[in-house]
Design a protein with these regions (language model features):
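A short alpha->beta transition loop at the rim of the catalytic pocket in nucleotide-sugar-dependent
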Residues: 107
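Long, basic N-terminal domains or extensions that often function
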Residues: 100
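Extreme N-terminal starter segment of soluble prokaryotic enzymes
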Residues: 2-3
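Solvent-exposed beta-strand sheet faces enriched in polar/charged residues
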Residues: 49, 90, 118-120, 352, ...
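N-terminal glycine-rich phosphate-binding loop for ADP-containing cofactors
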Residues: 16, 28, 43, 67-72, ...
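Short, active-site-adjacent cap segments at secondary-structure transitions
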Residues: 53-57, 96-97, 399-400
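A structural preference for short, pocket-lining loop segments at secondary-structure junctions
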Residues: 8-16, 26-67, 78-92, 112-116, ...
Length: 536
């Protein structure tokens, strides 16, 4: 997993641990051996590169459940930093967590112009554990480092270079960039751990993190640990960081977040579907240009698809187009996309009222009103013009996809794809197979959702599937509290205090009351209402 090649007094240390080159125990041991070989050879420089699509993207999370095996990462990084041979980190892809800690232990850092850098440990209920909170402020300053450690968000190459974190930015061949850097090698800088840190007022940042953490412990701990770099020697600060990191590994929050991390990856590729090659998706049709349909359309455009919005009349279709263009404009205004990307998305969007426009679509998703007969009518229109190999999906929140697709030609292509609003932002997509849905169709649907940057989860046919089934129980208990005398404002406040980003009534106000109201009426009429009826 770690190869060392020495030529003309220069060493090339290559990490090859696909898919994201995590710092597993074998990689750590390989790096220790590499340092020893480089020292013995008295190399002039040693460069660390990674095979594949990225530099080291973190530690091996699977090791976090038990005692960390030797060698420990802090010891590896200390050995790299203390080596008589200066190391150069040659980076591309994502340099995250232990990967950034590795780079910070090197004398110099050079990176491809499209690289991203971050300390995302807080997203797993942790803080860095190999000097990240102590070395980073010694390179880019205390406030910037504290922000990166506490919010867990990566920064791009341009930003990290402006922070002072890079010695060279390159585009193209990293081998040529490394050769050019070595040819004009600057004097070796002071080791990162030996640098001082200027103190900074973190009061505003603490208030910001306290507000955004919403009950999570790790963000504030990461900030406070990073702040130690301004008052303690590196060795003392690193010792506290390591001890805190190990304590957090055993915390309930971190265990839960790590479980979620692994679960959210395993569910996106069901084992039984791995034998199927997903069909290519080029043209996406969305029937219904309301809030949900516009969000799905925007997500599809962002993924590079051609999108057509179909509505009941031209006026409604143009209104749907306007909603999608508003999302594109907001992304442009916020800097998430460039003008050229915005224009490309607008050019890939069309809208109309003629179902004939769906004749060459690879997938159509209906996002119309939550009424089974309305949805069946849409399915019939789509089935009449689309290829029998194209997917036809319902975005229903509660209804049985079997009933919506019953009697339609080509039953193997029908399924449910339930997005959550706003669909251009929310990650979860429930993939609901009918009794007749083909595994090939399911494989294509999963691949399509992954391509949108979503987390697709297979669910069986039941009222509300997974997300709304949970939400219904949550909302039902909230309604009982209101019926017993609490106000909706009090319920919302209590849930926000618990850590929810929104209370149940705020959430309903934002997403709309129609679907919930229609569902309660449907359940009451069918005699399936699961509790006492609340007339609000």
């Amino acid at each position: 997993m770690v190869d060392v090649a020495i030529e003309n007094g220069h060493a090339l240390v290559t990490i090859d641990n696909p898919p994201v080159n995590p710092l597993s125990v074998s990689v750590r041991q390989g790096l220790m051996d590499a340092v020893r070989r480089v020292n013995e050879a008295k190399c002039e420089t040693a460069a660390i590169v990674c095979a594949g699509r990225t530099f080291v993207a973190g530690g091996d999370i699977s090791e976090f459940a038990g005692p960390p095996p030797l060698p420990h990462l802090p010891d590896v990084l200390d050995a790299i930093e203390a080596s008589p041979t200066p190391f150069i980190a040659v980076m591309h892809g994502t340099v995250l967590g232990g990967g950034l800690e590795l780079a910070l232990a090197c004398a110099w850092r050079i990176a491809d112009e499209k690289t991203r850098f971050g300390l995302p440990e807080v997203n797993l209920g942790l803080i860095p554990g190999a000097g990240g909170t102590q070395r980073l402020p010694r390179v880019i300053g205390l406030e910037r480092a504290a922000r990166m450690a506490a919010n867990g968000k990566p920064v791009n190459t341009k930003t990290f270079e402006e922070f002072g974190g890079l010695d060279l930015v390159f585009s193209g061949d990293p081998t040529q960039a490394l050769a050019a850097f070595r040819a004009a090698l600057p004097a070796r800088p002071v080791n990162t751990s030996d640098r001082s840190v200027e103190n900074a007022d973190l009061t505003a940042l603490k208030a910001e993190i306290a507000k955004s953490a919403k009950g999570a412990d790790a963000p504030m701990i990461a900030l406070e640990t990073t702040a130690l770099a301004a008052t303690l020697p590196f060795a003392e600060g690193s010792k506290i960081e390591r001890q805190t990191h190990l304590e957090l590994r055993a915390s309930a929050q971190s265990r839960a977040l790590r479980r979620l991390f692994f679960a959210s990856r395993s569910v996106t590729r069901p084992d039984r579907l791995k034998a199927f090659t997903p069909a290519a998706i080029n043209h996406v049709v969305i029937v219904g240009g309301g809030l949900m349909g516009a969000g799905i359309a925007a997500a599809s455009l962002a993924a590079g698809h051609r999108v057509t919005i179909l509505e009941r009349d031209t006026e409604s279709a143009e209104a749907g187009r306007g909603r999608v263009e508003a999302i594109i404009a907001k992304d442009l205004e916020s800097g998430r996309i460039t003008e050229s990307k915005a224009e490309a998305r607008r050019a890939s969007l069309s809208a109309g009222a003629n179902y004939a426009a769906a004749f060459d679509a690879d997938i159509a998703i209906e996002a119309v009103f939550e009424d089974p007969e309305v949805k069946r009518a849409v399915f019939a229109e789509l089935a009449a013009v689309m290829s029998e190999t194209a997917l036809i999906a319902t975005n229903t929140s509660y209804l049985d996809p079997n009933l919506i697709s019953e009697g339609m030609p080509g039953p193997g292509r029908f399924l449910g794809l339930h997005f959550f609003s706003p669909a251009n932002i929310m990650k979860l997509v429930e993939v609901v197979g009918t009794s007749a849905t083909a595994d090939q169709s399911m494989a294509t649907a999963f691949a399509f959702a992954r391509g949108l940057g979503k987390i697709p989860v297979e669910t069986g046919v039941c009222d509300g599937f997974i997300g709304n089934r949970i939400l219904s129980a949550y909302r039902r208990q909230a309604d009982y509290m209101v019926a017993d005398g609490a106000s909706p404002y009090e319920v919302d406040k209590a849930m926000r205090k618990l850590g929810m980003p929104l209370g149940p009534y705020e959430l309903q106000d934002r997403t709309g009351l129609q679907i919930s109201w229609a569902n309660r009426k449907r359940q009451l009429a069918a005699g399936t209402w699961p509790g006492r009826y609340v007339d609000i």
